[in-house]
């Protein structure tokens, strides 16, 4: 039996001038979240949501497409300047950053917030292929 669906809320166009782009680039995927300065999400995208599957998600091109998608959504909300926080060891870091710059955002700062262990947990064993 079909469930009753609530009417979808219309997305309110916020008018935010400055934001923070969080680029999370792992070995398997690249996620881009654009938030306001307080950390409330405005727009997000990832290589997986752009239709890439499997090992294609980890490519720089997939990261570029995801960054363009998130950037266009953020521009609809009025974001013009960005601080960029890059996290992770993936290959999509630079290409996502270049894609955001190419969209016309004024990038005020770039920070690498990759967590580094100060001799914490034991790492996983080396792969033998």
From Swiss-Prot:
- Biological process GO terms, please? translation
Q: Which Gene3D superfamilies match?
A: Ribosomal protein S11
Cite the entry's keywords alphabetically.
Ribonucleoprotein, Ribosomal protein, RNA-binding, rRNA-binding
Pfam families noted in UniProt: Ribosomal_S11 (PF00411)
Transmembrane as a keyword?
A: no
Q: Which domain of life is it from?
A: Bacteria
Entry GO CC = ribonucleoprotein complex; ribosome
Chain ranges passing through the membrane = none
Q: Which InterPro entries match?
A: Ribosomal_uS11, Ribosomal_uS11_bac-type, Ribosomal_uS11_CS, Ribosomal_uS11_sf
**GO MF term list:** rRNA binding; structural constituent of ribosome
Q: Does the keyword Ribosomal protein apply?
A: yes
Role noted for this protein:
Located on the platform of the 30S subunit, it bridges several disparate RNA helices of the 16S rRNA. Forms part of the Shine-Dalgarno cleft in the 70S ribosome.
Q: How does it assemble?
A: Part of the 30S ribosomal subunit. Interacts with proteins S7 and S18. Binds to IF-3.
Instruction: Report the sequence similarity comment from the record.
Output: Belongs to the universal ribosomal protein uS11 family.
Q: What is this protein called?
A: Small ribosomal subunit protein uS11
In its UniProt entry, the species of origin is given as Jannaschia sp. (strain CCS1)
Q: Which gene encodes it?
A: rpsK
